[in-house]
């Protein structure tokens, strides 16, 4: 049984680790030799010196609030730290439904995040070496590359469909629901074609709504998610309630919740 003193000791150690990480991060981003042009320019307008006056997590309160609008437009290279010059750089974007999309510069974080995530996946449902289907947004999206890397990190090959979420939003705004339904069918048709082409795909990522549509699309062809060989499903991106999870597992996948490969 954990004692009160052990909890206090753990909390103190965690706090010290957080403070050290904060200090290291601020030193990196605001130092002339490693910082990005954006943060070095912001540093000049601050009424304090981040390099000498930010020593712990609480000191971050000295900074003004971050403004989302800073992420719209370019030049996007202003976000690349000098300490990362020369490394392959990716740009991921938001939906862009309210004007210029917000951009995010990424070098390695999606790889790091999903390699850590990989260690949480049960091999029983997500076997090492298995091929994956990415049934989700394509284009300048972090998620697509992240799932692809997750699959590759686990020794598999990732198959993707073309899905433009910006077009989906436009169809909804215009009230073109018939067009929306046809576009959804177009996306599901791509997925069904891949799953029934003999690629030995066992795992997939998709959103809850697309997962449901895929199940119905396969049923129309007299097959099912289980019959095409899927054993593990990583799903997210939109609301995923306990009630829907139960419906998905028991009705769409045909199994009890406690034995499901839905993650």
Residues of each region from the PLM?
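Active-site glycine/GP-rich loop and adjacent strand/helix microenvironment
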Residues: 2-28, 49, 152-263
